[in-house]
Every structure is written in C-alpha cells, then in structure tokens.
Design a protein with these regions (language model features):
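Glycine-rich Rossmann NAD(P)(H)-binding loop
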Residues: 164, 186-192, 219-226, 235-241, ...
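Conserved Rossmann-fold NAD(P)-dependent oxidoreductase catalytic core, especially the SDR/UDP-sugar
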Residues: 92-135
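Conserved C-terminal active-site "lid" loop/helix of NAD(P)H-dependent oxidoreductases
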Residues: 198, 231-234, 258-288, 298
Length: 316
C-alpha cells in the first residue's frame, strides 16, 4: 500500500516516517521545501497543500493520505485566520486533491481539542456535541466538517495528548517534574486525564487503513486507561528505576500555594480532568498495544538513554 504523508518533520510525523516503512507500507512524503528525511525508506515530493491543483501529481497512485501537518495548539499570538487557512482550508484542499488522484481514504490527524476545551466534566465520546474553546480546536472541527462535504472516504482521529520519544510542550514539563529528586505533594489531585502513546496512535492509523467498510467519521483516540497526575509521575519515575515518592497533600492547600505564586495556569493543567472513551475505534478492531503506565516508563527511559543531560534541561 502506497501512503502519502504530510507533516513528516513534526513530532508525530517523524515517528510515522520511521515506523510505517518498517510495517510494510510504501511511503511518499509531501514537503513544502527540500529537506533531509530521517530515513531513506521514503520518497519525497515537493508541493504546497494550500494549492491542491499542484498536488495532483504528488498524489498519483497513492492509496491513502495521512495528513499530519498543521499549526500546533501551543503557538501563542497566532491569529485565528491563520489557523483557519492552515488547519482548515489546507486540509480540505489536500482532500480534494486526494479525491481527484483516486486515493481511497483520507486520514486527518485531528485533536481532542476539536471536541472540547482543556478540561471536560464528563467522559467524552463522539456522540457528544463538539464544543472547542480556542482557535486551534475550532480550526480542526471546521476541517472535519469540510471533509464531510467531500466525496471521499475520510477519517478524523481526535487524538488525546500524544506522548513518545521527542515529545515537547506539556508532556515535556511533566517529564521535568518527574525527573526532579524531590518528593511531590500531588497525591491529593484526583482528576484524571487521557493520554495517547504514539505507538497506539500508529496502531489506530493501521486499523483505519485496514478497514474495508466506508467510515466517513471522526474517532476519539486515547489510551484506554486515564491516569491522575500522581500516577503519571509514579510511572515515569519507575522508568528511571526510582521510587514514585508522591505523597498526599490537600488539593485545596496545593491550589492556594500555586495561586499565591502566580501559577494559576500550571495548577489548572495539573488539576483538570479530561477523560475520553475510545470504544468506537475499538469496535472496528483497534487494540492499543501499549498500556499508559508502561508507555510513560519507556518514555523516561528513552529520554535518559538518549541524553541524560538534556533531560535535566527541559524547561517549565
């Protein structure tokens, strides 16, 4: 099967470039400008996904497109129109080009933020009405709605926070916290959050590629087990061969401490729940190969093996 991939230089894209050829797929990487690939097992084609008519040749003979490119959530100061142009319009343009080229399926790597804000009071499923709260989430949801109007078999994977070797952002901050030698007073935080191992995302993509039925829908995707922040820290520290060293402390006092220090946003990230139910994807055959606690332990071990000094320099 010949796959076309966008976003090959991003965190998720780099994993896909490396792993998909190992699993027997032929890979054609779509690049905006010439650049070196991390592997010689993929061919590269230069093109601009914002100009779909220029992409027809690049998508010739492709069986499916995996669209991973886009503006990331954590980019501060980006106007909403930029999110719409890059995350919405370019996605729809690429899907149109894929349809003209005869691709059988279009896989859009979306985000759980197309479904909700940074936290949610209920377990999320695809049956709930989406209510994104920022420009990033709205741009992803608008892209899905645009795909629904096209005559192509599309799938949107609304991924929870993805983690794996090389991850940045909020997960990198949590890694730094776990790397600290200090005991942490996080045991009183009972909120749970769903995460997604990059290996489990790859398995989800393979499931969608192998499915014969027409899909044309979004799927929420996350590791089946949601963890508290204390459980995440404990799993990471076990990956370093250390005792978890997380103790109970009243959540209200912890909140007062954070707010007194002007760290309101940091506390919200630690204390807010966001739990999703990936049962719909599992019903079409997805079996995530990696448990969250195992994945987090491996994440820390990989970071330590790769660069023990750099692990200490992850910036909060």
């Amino acid at each position: 099967m010949l796959l076309a991939l966008t976003g090959s230089t991003g965190f998720i894209g780099q994993h896909l470039v490396r792993e998909l050829p190992r699993r027997g797929y032929r890979l054609r990487v779509l690049l905006r400008r010439p650049t070196s690939l991390p592997t010689n097992t993929a061919s590269a084609v230069i093109g601009d996904i914002a100009r779909p008519r220029n992409m027809s040749a690049a998508l010739q003979d492709v069986d499916a497109v995996i669209h991973s490119a886009g503006l990331a959530q954590a980019m501060s100061g980006v106007p909403e129109d930029d999110y719409r142009v890059i995350n919405t319009e370019a996605t729809i343009n690429l899907a149109r080009a894929a349809r003209r080229a005869g691709a059988k399926r279009f896989i859009f790597l979306s985000s759980i933020r197309a479904q909700c804000g940074p936290t949610a009071d209920t377990v999320l499923t695809e049956a709930l009405e989406p209510s994104p709260t920022d420009a990033y989430g709205r741009s992803k949801l608008e892209a899905e709605r645009g795909l629904a109007e096209l005559n192509i078999d599309w799938v949107s994977l609304r991924a929870a926070l993805v983690y794996g070797p090389g991850v940045k952002g909020n997960m990198a901050q949590l890694m730094r916290l776990a790397r600290s030698p200090l005991p942490l007073p996080l045991g009183g935080l009972r909120a749970r959050r769903s995460l997604l191992a990059v290996e489990n995302l790859l398995a989800a993509i393979e499931t969608v590629l192998a499915t014969q039925e027409t899909l044309r829908r979004p799927f929420i995707v996350a590791d089946p087990q949601a963890l508290t922040v204390a459980e995440m820290i404990a799993a990471m520290r076990r990956g370093l061969g250390r005792w978890p060293n997380v103790f109970w402390f009243p959540a209200t006092l912890l909140e007062h401490s954070f707010r007194a220090a002007g760290r309101n946003e940091a506390y919200e990230r630690l204390s807010g729940s966001l739990v999703v139910d990936p049962a719909a994807l599992m019903r079409i055959g997805w079996t995530p190969p990696l448990a969250t606690e195992v994945g987090l332990a491996r994440l820390m071990q990989a970071a330590l093996d790769r660069d023990p000094i750099q692990l200490n320099r992850i910036t909060v």
